[in-house]
Regions:
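Carbohydrate-interacting regions of secretory-pathway proteins
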Residues: 1-136
Length: 136
């Protein structure tokens, strides 16, 4: 998100930004158990999508709702194994590599600049060997 989108955020709203989603395989399994159907709006392998009022043109394959870039391959490993995510965001384009292979992303991202945010939605999460580099 941007500084403006974070400071004006109301409770329950999502900040503006582009999300690179990291979900454990158990999330999809739990969804299937609760709904009786396979998820068609998310994967556990590296979706990239806009949040809040942000916009992005997703790379294919695209989720049925049209704004989410689904990964071209299912390369993430289940817990407790570690995954390597490489995210590159330059000039309004975001690209994601999972365990060494490019799988998803998008272009024409708005906002095109902002903060890097790490978050968890109600479950513990661990990161290791995190490296951040400012790119042009």
């Amino acid at each position: 998100g941007t500084e403006e989108s974070l400071s004006a955020l109301k409770p329950g709203e999502l900040p503006q930004g582009i999300e690179v989603q990291v979900l454990d395989h158990g999330y999809a399994k739990r969804y299937e158990e609760q709904t009786g159907k396979k998820p068609d709006w998310f994967t556990c392998h590296g979706d990239v999508f806009p949040t809040g009022k942000s916009t992005m043109t997703p790379f294919p394959p695209v989720a049925p709702r049209g704004s989410r870039s689904f990964p071209s391959k299912e390369l993430s490993k289940p817990s407790p194994e570690w995954n390597h995510y490489y995210v590159r965001a330059i000039n309004g384009e975001v690209r994601l590599w999972v365990n060494g292979e490019e799988v998803s992303g998008g272009t024409a991202c708005n906002p095109a600049t902002g903060f890097l945010c790490l978050e968890s939605e109600g479950s513990p999460v661990e990161f290791r060997n995190l490296k951040v580099r400012l790119l042009p």
